[in-house]
Design a protein with these regions (language model features):
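NTP-dependent small-molecule kinase module
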Residues: 23-25, 142-214
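ATP-dependent small-molecule kinase phosphotransfer cores
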Residues: 40-114
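P-loop (Walker A) phosphate-binding loop of NTP-binding proteins
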Residues: 12
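A glycine- and Lys/Arg-enriched "phosphate-lid" helix/loop adjacent to the NTP-binding pocket
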Residues: 103-168
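Walker A/P-loop
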Residues: 18
Length: 214
């Protein structure tokens, strides 16, 4: 392959995505795969300014303001696509913690189809594999509440909003054909499913060159 394999993991809050990422990384590295772990939030040099807009949006929901948030996030992903993803080894597997699929969960006014087009128009890198991590909303809400950092969400304030977020994300996942991992059992079970899907994608692409995907 002429570039890294790009895998994005997204989902609502509290679904165990970070723990799953760590477990997937460990299994792939044990199989002598070169794994690069990235985080959209930590890779985004403009996140501070964007979060100021998000905070305004939470206090005063407005379509134009949410659209501006979506545009800024898409601009950031374009920057990450150009300045971070292109710097990774060609023989690696990039696992990123959140990418544009997460907008399906957290943006409540602008339709996801419109958000997706914003990202496509900016040549944001399209993952070779979109992994949507989900649980029943009540399970992820309880998990998030039990964490040391709690829900740690700017945009969600109650279970009802979290249920809506979960339903919206699962609907987008079905519409877009993302690989859905229901993380309600053991971490080993979920890890095995995702690693198996990553290996299937690798095997499908192996043997012929894959160029830049846009």
């Amino acid at each position: 392959m002429t570039r890294p394999l790009f895998v994005a993991l997204d989902g609502p809050k509290g679904v165990g995505k970070t723990s799953l990422l760590e477990a997937i990384t460990e299994v792939l590295r044990a199989d002598n795969q070169k794994v690069i772990r990235l985080c959209e939030k930590k890779s985004d040099p403009f996140r501070g300014e964007t979060m100021q807009l998000v905070n305004r949006l939470v206090r005063h929901p407005d379509r134009n303001l949410e659209l501006e948030v979506c545009q800024r996030l898409a601009d950031s992903r374009r920057w990450i696509s150009q300045h971070v993803l292109t710097k990774q080894p060609a023989d690696s597997i990039i696992l990123i913690d959140r990418w544009y699929p997460s907008d399906a969960a957290f943006r409540r006014i602008v339709p996801f189809a419109e958000i997706l087009q914003l990202n496509i128009d900016r040549n944001v890198q399209v993952p070779d594999l979109h992994v949507g991590v989900v649980t029943a909303a009540e399970i992820s809400w309880a998990r998030a509440g039990a964490r040391r950092r709690g829900l740690s969400s700017t945009v969600l304030r109650g279970l009802e909003e979290h249920v809506a977020c979960t339903e919206a994300f699962e609907l987008a996942a079905a519409d877009q054909g993302w690989f859905l991992c229901r993380n309600e059992g053991t971490i080993e079970e979920a890890t095995g499913r995702v690693v198996g899907e990553i290996n299937r994608v690798v095997n499908r692409l192996r043997g012929h060159s894959i160029g830049p995907r846009r």
